[in-house]
Amino acid sequence: MATNYDRYVERMRKIADIGHSIAVLNWDKETYLPKKSANMRSQQIATLSGIMHEEFTNPKFGNLLKRLNKQRNLDDDKKKNVTVTLNDYHKATKFTKRFVMQKSMAVSKCFQAWLQAREANDFRLYQKSLEELVKIKRIEAKKLGSAAEHLYDNLLDQYEPGLTVAKSDKIFNGMKKPLKKLINKINKKKAPKKNFLYKKYDKDAQWNLGIYILNEIGYDFDRGRQDISTHPFTTSFSANDVRLTTRIDE
């Protein structure tokens, strides 16, 4: 007989499958997607993002998480999984499906505008989309709660739980003095030769260097691959499918 935790795992696997499907579409968007397919791809990603949000914020799933959170017979690992998921659930329920899809579309639109602006070396092509995305992120930060000292705290917490603007300021302010000393020390040294940075290097040689380095560090090409993208990144669709991209610059 399935336990409540088994039901939790089953639900999370379904949600993860949708998330990994979105990741595949995003990977393709940044590697092989034809230019004229961008709008439809943005819609596809937004649709799946909305479905994933619905699955995750389903009240029945929320009730299951609350019951599990009160169980005392869970081991530490399972308890931690439930605690983190319940925290994410509370955050996710602050947003509507419509908002999630709107944000997804804005991110995709902003990315496409960035590609055009980068190619044309013209920030104006990117500015409007970026401003729209910043507005949406401000709304997101406000919806996440007003308890934070700084509005950006709510967004920082998504990537580094517990980090705040005050804490990050303390970290960076503490780095200023030693960094200034290091820079002064470097400036007193003889400048190294850097003409090699501006030479022309064969495309295939650059590509093969990446493959060589990946082999040297033990990267398993049966569980991943290297491709080219405008902005290099790493993504994963499962433990057996972790992909990375590189950029070639002659």
Predicted regions mapped to residue ranges:
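A well-structured
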Residues: 1-163
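Contiguous, non-catalytic segments that form substrate-binding/exosite surfaces or channel walls
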Residues: 103-250
